Amino acid sequence: DPFGNHVARLVFPEKMTSLSIEVELIAPMTVINPFDFFVEEYAEQFPFDYRDELKKELAPYLETPKAGPKLAGWIGKVDREERSITDFLVSLNQRLANEIQYMIRMEPGVQTPEQTLTLGSGSCRDSAWLLVHICRHLGLAARFVSGYLIQLTADVKALDGPSGTETDFTDLHAWTEVFVPGAGWIGLDPTSGLLAGEGHLPLAATAEPASAAPISGATEPCEVTFSFNMSVTRVHEDPRVTKPYTEDQWAEILALGEQVDAQLQALDVRLTMGGEPTFVSIDDMDAPEWTIAAQGPTKRGLSETLLRRLRPHFAPQSLIHYQQGKWYPGEPLPRWALACYWRRDGKPMWQDDRWLADMDRDYGVDDAKALQFAQALTRRLGVSDSHLIPCFEDAYYYLWLERTQPIDVDLRGEDLKDDDNRLRLARLLERGLDATVGYTLPLAATQGGWLSGSWPLRREQLYLVPGDSPMGLRLPLSALPIARREEPQPTSLFEEQAPLADLHGEVASRYSAMYAEGEGSLHHVAAGQDWQEQRPELIDCGVIGTALCIEPRDGKLFVFMPPLARLESYLELLASVEHTAAELNLPVCIEGYAPPSDNRIEKFMITPDPGVIEVNIMPAASWPELVRNTETLYEEARLTRLGTEKFMLEGRHTGTGGGNHVTLGGRTPAESPFL
């Protein structure tokens, strides 16, 4: 026909009792970007005028019948302020899709624009013809397109909005194309409000709908029964990120894993396998924090969300621990690290999640609540609260620092640029240099409990090392009396270790025993004594060099755990902290030193790396466990809006750009096949 569409004409000289038409086509369904087009400079902004030579060639598609009152009213509401032609077409298409309800209409022919607007509904061909009229009245060349729409079920359910069809299907469809200089004919589907993509297969594009009808003609009067059927069959599929294997291939992989597992068990090879997969943001993968920077505005929040999603699967009643991560040259502060610890025997390390604070919430914790918590904790530990030391920022240092700043910098205003020192100083000045930062409790573990004591200092108060890290990392330990003491030796990982006791129960019963029946005063074997009197042999100069810190920060209460050599001591202190939190109805965040390395506990961690976050997943001792860990991790990461793919500048598909290491070993060093 004049539009270049192929037309077949069939003439039947004799009467026929049936007519069957079968259409078969093979369509590559490679995903395309419908916005990937070039626009001539003069047409980048709407409205624009076609050049004279184009107007002649586009004359049939610019023909504008007189608009009825409904159509004129609809067009009159179109915002014609200058803007990007792409944005204009998208908004026009979406407005029509929202205002015209789609309906299946089996009657022949196409509704007029007036009918469609009056009814507020129509079939795909009715909406397409209406959009053709609207575009032409706005000075845009438009044509009617008839063809097929193929929709395939998604490999992965969508995180936002509907996931699309549950089964593959195809149907006859109609949509509109608008001619944009440079880009050519751009498909707009007013039924869905989307641009035409790889699933829109055009068979005919014409100035009038009648010319694009798939079948037209006549028969003599007769009784007709009509039926149709359309189906889609996937002939070939390439492996892709969302579906790398067929079901048969995946079954073979699982079977092979079981076979290897059986051989390892038969030979008593106690191999474990973990990993360090990396992830990037699905929404903003081009931001510096997801390309080159180790830290950024969203990385920690997404990591905390992922950790809380993984925790119920891997380690319910586990400890969430916030700790210092790696520190590389050129970075102003150490990186953060989020960790989750749990006991291998299945007993709780942290009993009640109500007492683990949510980092996104402000609990209104102030200095008074921090002191109340610290005093209650000392009672549970059986030490005197007289050893609690309030900590302050070093006012003299910050007053000196303030005087060294340029005279034109307003430290209490917005003129801070990106200078870390100035930002830190401004925050401190706003809070007040005389405010208590938190409380420190010198603390050491003994076989029978806990010991505390005072810290002799040259200055009357304890002033923290300048900085903005947690106060536990800024204690002036170098100002304490020099002692010749042996560092506590960690438990050897090659030793046989006794099972862990129920330390939560022990802490609760010991605390109850400290109080005489009906009395409110504390009774303890060490009551009224400093720890130096109890264990003078521990430290030469009589000063404990480790401490627990309690700090109100950002409306939450942070407990900084001291370094402890034995896991039992760490768990006992942790249980005391939780019982205190429950007693005061005050959730806490646990930070500071991690539990000592021990074969009786397990962990996974999430840390930042340049351009990615890295998940240090715990080792698995069997193939089914490894499959479960891997599938759970990647699914929960996706639901957190973290993915494993990026695109290079020219569009090439690539991975995260971070390492994806595999770690091999054993449950204990003695069981490692390599050692």
Stretches found by the model and what they are:
Residues 431-446, 458, 595-600, 632, ...:
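Metal-dependent DNA replication initiation modules
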Residues 2, 8-13, 614-638:
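Aromatic/His-enriched, Gly/Pro-containing loop or helix-boundary segments
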Residues 186-197, 622-636, 666-675:
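Helical (often loop-to-helix) elements that flank the catalytic cores of nucleotide-handling enzymes
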Residues 554-561, 606-619, 660-666:
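Short, hydrophobic beta-strand segments
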